[in-house]
Amino acid sequence: MLIVMNRGCRLVSRIPLGFRRLKRNPNPGLRNILCRRYSPLALSKEVTEALKNNVPVVALESTIITHGMPYPQNEELAIQVESKVRSMGAVPATIALLNGQCTIGLEQFQLSELAKSGETAYKVSRRDLSYVASQRLNGGTTVAATMILARAAGIDVFATGGIGGVHRGAENSMDISADLIELGRTRVAVVSAGVKSILDIGRTLEVLETQGVPVVTLGPPKSAFPAFFSRESKFQSPLSLETPQLIANMLFSNIQLGQECGTLVAIPTPHHCSIDYEKMEALIETCLQRSVQLGITGKNVTPWLLGELLRESKGKSLNTNIDLVLNNAEKASLIAKELAVLKEKSSFFPTNTGNTFETKPVKQDFFYGKVSDKGVSSSKKKITETTSKPAEVVCVGSVSIDSVLKLDNPLTSKFLGTSHPCHSEQAFGGVAHNMALASSLMGASTKLVSCVGTKSVPTSSIKEYLTKSSLQHTIVEKSNFTSCSYTAINDCNGNLLLAGADMAIMENLSYSEIKDDLNDAKYICFDGNISPSLMLDITTSKSSKQRVVFEPTSGPKTLKILKVLSVASIDFITPNKFELDVLFQAMKDGNFFENESWWQKLNSFGITSSFYNEIERFTKSTGIEEITENGILQKCFHLLPFIKNIIVKLGPNGALLISSEKLQGVNSNSASLFTPGNVTVKYYPVPKVIATPVNASGTGDTFIGTFTALLSKGWGMDDAIDTAQKAAGLTLQCNFSVNPEIKTLLK
């Protein structure tokens, strides 16, 4: 018997279709023959998902790999830089041209092959992009080319070592880097250790001023502009700001103003690796004179000079170069994270503002047309609402038409890829709808808050159904969207094999459209289909007496709650084992468990070594070894400082409660544990009410709706969870998303 089976989902990318990542053959020397048409831009899956969900992304250039240093040091540094970005909670996007395809986010084998290619790869600036792409060549991108491709993908922050600039003697040679011109017309923040010190820093700053490029140094007022190898040059920085957050505010203002210029963010070289400015100047002058004598010009000057400095400094310049690149990546990640928060909270900022290859100014009405978090909603939106007594439970999320196909016979692998006899059923569903319906059937005053599209057939059916039902609801109509739909394929026992969900419309529901519906609620439940910004607004805007319940819905959608957990805590989460694993790993990778406040909170729970001895007794008494074998308890303890109550749905094995609150109605028995710090752990086995399983879809939703309704009516925790499991079991035995008979459990 399987009580809990959350529905799968199809993630709908906001990246323009032509820019989605194409399948690549693991051999980078072969053309991609799997694609029907050639796309100039390929985003990795990791970068695509990050951009779609407003996870901070940091672009990284690749000339440092192809032309910056020899193999294998170049590959080692590239891996270190990406690891640094990830450790700071951002997603790295190394950019390069592979077989002519502009690739945003390299796989490990691609990074390795590029590092091995070295200077046989092209050094690609703006002028080289079309040639290298058309000839299907490999290339490392300079600052200019990386900016262009980052902007096309919608990446706002780019970390590098140092930018190009005005070469010494440029009054005669006219040797001025394209990086400076690009900064004047491509809106990407370039985080670097200033300008490469082999260049003319003073004239470079003058050109940047002419191009209208803001130049800001991370540091106190009137900071010196850094000189790459040296922490300070003899030139004062045009602007100075003391924290990454202040710099992010500046970048966000640049976006709001609709400017298309980039920003140069200068990061002073760390003290421990900085080289004395005067000593480095003398060494550079010697090397420059030698380059003139040898006739080295153009784009060959910089790599030659860096090689000479490495030799003359006996390796110190390389060590400094590596340290400053890692330092820049760290600071860029912090800035990107702060900028992502600002974008998430903004009332008009879209999730992805990439422009394709054209870097034309983005019209302001494009921004304002986006449904926002707390901003003013469009007056063109039609809102249909039922009115009744104030709702104690409000469920925010999807309402859909669910199609369930149950196979007549067992499925074997040799019969995949063909049709099978089955029985089909259609019903109205959606996670929030099912939770609301279950809550209403259990006697709680409940309201569903959702939206429907105007361009799909199911819309009229959904509206008609809700109008005739007794379920209170607020439905927002959105033009040019399709309503939610869900299709599940179950095996002959009713267990889910595969499902597809089209819930894209829910990403466009805004807080301003529904905030009045939340005022009277004791419990606000939302599913994983709504946007991270709406989750954040609901959580941060609720009153102190209101409780928030998050139903993850699926593994990928579980990660939407990270934006909330970075700034606030939530009251309840109801993951299954897979969703718990996904959330734990993401928080671990995002360094949620590294700050001092987390340690202090965890220590206050009193989870000592003696308590772990109690866990062994607890495991034996419950007979559920997976609680410890799969690390479920340990993962929940890690999450507890962020989430007050965690109910892990164990499918046929029942449910597990972990709470940091003093709960009502939790009786002590052999299946319960209590720490000195008021942490409660209790296992709830499955009630013996299940006959023949028919349909697992909706069982988890029924559990949560019933559980929340009973809490709102003052039930204790034990009774609420036991009854919710019985309700889920009744739904398992029918073809409805919620079995109407669950109301008999109140008798």
Curated annotation (Swiss-Prot):
Location of the active site: 61, 196
Record's keyword annotation contains Lyase: yes
A GO BP annotation: pyrimidine nucleoside metabolic process
Cysteine-cysteine disulfides: none
Location of region: Pseudouridine-5'-phosphate glycosidase: 1-379
Entry-linked CDD domains: YeiC_kinase_like
Any one GO molecular-function label of the UniProt entry: metal ion binding
Ranges where the record places region Pseudouridine kinase: 380-747
Keywords (A to Z) from UniProt: ATP-binding, Cytoplasm, Glycosidase, Hydrolase, Kinase, Lyase, Manganese, Metal-binding, Nucleotide-binding, Transferase
Stated family: In the N-terminal section; belongs to the pseudouridine-5'-phosphate glycosidase family. In the C-terminal section; belongs to the carbohydrate kinase PfkB family.
Entry protein name: Pseudouridine-metabolizing bifunctional protein C1861.05
Organism encoding this protein: Schizosaccharomyces pombe (strain 972 / ATCC 24843)
Taxonomic path: Eukaryota, Fungi, Dikarya, Ascomycota, Taphrinomycotina
